[in-house]
Amino acid sequence: MRKRTLLISLSSGIVAVPLLRISPSEKTLKPELIRPPGSLEEKEFLRRCVKCGECMKVCLTNGLQPTLFEAGVEGIWSPRLVPLIGYCSYNCTLCGQVCPTGAIKKLSTGEKTKVKIGLAFIDQSRCLPYAFGKSCIVCEEHCPTPKKAIWFHEKEIGDRGGGRLSVKQPVVDPELCIGCGICEYKCPVKDLPAIRITSAGESRSKVNQPLLV
């Protein structure tokens, strides 16, 4: 009986140790894992982050939230941006200023506004101008970049009565989008926004980049 108990304990330990070491740095990063601006490359970020929560406390919009299992076991309680809750304020550098370990670099305002933490994608099946032919310019209005990362393609469509109308359909410029998330936060399609941010295109990763032809 003792031998069987010992074998079970040993086998459990052998399985458990590798599981604790699994993190997104060793596999494809998850789209919802949007790290604060100035965050180091994921493996080094997780090594340095002590999960103190200081960055989350100072976040002006409350957008920085604790990660659960999105970053593996190692990443539990590390910060990630959840645009549905709050966006990354364009000129804010507080998270890097309070980070005690350098997991999030201290950035000047000028440096921060050039950092990409993700990329916006439009779901045309939910976007009001695309799906319903209804006028909506909310995402473009709130885009904070000096040259708007969201622009409009004007398209003429037919209405139900056989008439024609012109609708402005939003388009994301991936070169200008910094992934701040204000477009997702402000989108009037509330249950599941028609424009959403993923971690694709983040400045800190050479691997997590969209294929733009």
Residue ranges and their predicted role:
Residues 1-213:
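Non-ligating segments of multi-cofactor redox enzymes
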